[in-house]
């Protein structure tokens, strides 16, 4: 099965930042859209719950929400926007500013690609 553009973008993110061990892209309801690599069972549901809770508690005026949480096994990073959320897992030594920068870069690329595709599909042949 061919990889989707979202899966390819997440694979690129893993190449861009060697600190990221896993990346998930979720829709606005918190359902899994794409992952790289395939997440362990149950992790996508937990990420979706985190995304929904972050939106309910912290979203203000459509601004993206950024959360990072450190635990013994590593760090969880979340960016939630009105359209999508991205969750990444890293080792504890990762620098949050760099991880968020790379995550935002890939989310921006995905948004541009979606806009270009919408224009392409919406264009009528002359």
Regions picked out by a protein language model, each given a short descriptive name:
Residues 1-22, 28-126:
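Acidic, low-complexity cytosolic segments
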């Amino acid at each position: 099965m061919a990889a989707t553009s979202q899966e390819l973008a997440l694979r690129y993110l893993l190449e861009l930042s060697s600190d990221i061990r896993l990346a998930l892209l979720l829709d606005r309801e918190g359902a899994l859209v794409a992952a790289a690599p395939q997440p362990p069972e149950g992790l996508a549901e937990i990420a979706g719950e985190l995304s929904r809770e972050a939106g309910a508690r912290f979203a203000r005026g459509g601004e993206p929400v950024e959360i990072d949480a450190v635990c013994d096994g590593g760090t969880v990073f979340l960016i939630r926007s009105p359209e999508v959320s991205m969750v990444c897992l890293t080792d504890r030594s990762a620098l949050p500013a760099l991880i968020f920068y790379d995550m935002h870069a890939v989310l921006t690329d995905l948004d541009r690609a979606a806009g270009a595709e919408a224009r392409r599909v919406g264009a009528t042949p002359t």
